[in-house]
Amino acid sequence: GTKNAYDNYYLANPYKQMILSGKVGNKELDDKVRRLLRLAFHTTLNKNRPLGSVASAEHVEAARKIGEEGIVLLQNQNGTLPINLNKTKKIAVIGENAVKMMTVGGGSSSLKVKYETLPLDGIKKRFGKDAEIVFARGYVGDPGGEYNGVVTGQNLKDNRSEKELIDEAVKVAKSADFVVFVGGLNKSEFQDSEGADRKSLSLPYNQDVLISSLAKANKNLAVVLVTGNAVSMPWVKEVPSILQTWYLGSEAGNALASVLAGDANPSGKLPFSFPVKLEDNGAHKLGEFPGNKEEIAAGKGKDKNNPINIKYNEGIFVGYRWHDTKNIKPLFSFGHGLSYTTFEIGKV
């Protein structure tokens, strides 16, 4: 699934089959390739640039390092992370986002990565020689993989009930020395997608219940949140360690594994505040979003020809400005981010 994600992108594979079968010739294909090459040659800054400078080993290393530096360590009680391999011989990886492709993107970007290292793959590569790695799905979110015309090729269909999935995950968690939960959001509709807002600040797909269940099953737990924005965390006091990874790109799995192992010291900081609840944000506290209740009741907002009027009364007091002005304590503050480094202050 991760190697042939774009075989069915628009005309890719169907057109190839038409050429191979002799239904069409290469004339049109050659013309399109010439146009791409012409643009590439005309726009390059260095006409002597050697071939093979796309997705090179240096680019892979840069992608991994960027991923490592973007990870934010939100919480790490009792030094739960990094994983101590002297005490860990079995690691349970739980969660759909551990095996789900996240680099795909359609629309104007038409993003096509050469490869993607998934979290489970990265963890197996880094820890597999020293510990047994086991996996449980935990929840079913988006079993498909089509985003704005790009098809990943993955098929993550699973017909088990939420109870069956959680029961399996808890059983696996109890059998392990350490648990890494990889969850969060994805790029399906009403998640981290364009053209639609999220329906809730909460994690979807029953993940809150799953995380609480895992916390009861194993105290050595790291929650890895793959999201593009804030989520509520009703279980925040139940889990010892939380990593906010965002979407880490093609080296996601290796970057995450490096931080989990302590090969890389997490140094990322939050670019905005995470609220405890939705009403801690000005737009929601003032009652203006998603619009005037009377207008919504009258049927407005259903299409672009019948819009809802929303007045942003909070003005410049958005994010941390609203929290500071109203003395609202966020879940995690703008600029927050821990590391594995410990400090001691001597006599002053």
PLM region spans:
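Hydrophobic helix-and-loop "lid/oligomerization" segment in the mid-to-C-terminal part
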Residues: S53-S56, A136-K237
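Secreted, periplasmic, or luminal enzymes acting at the cell surface/secretory milieu
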Residues: A5-G107, L111-L120, K124-D130, V134-K157, ...
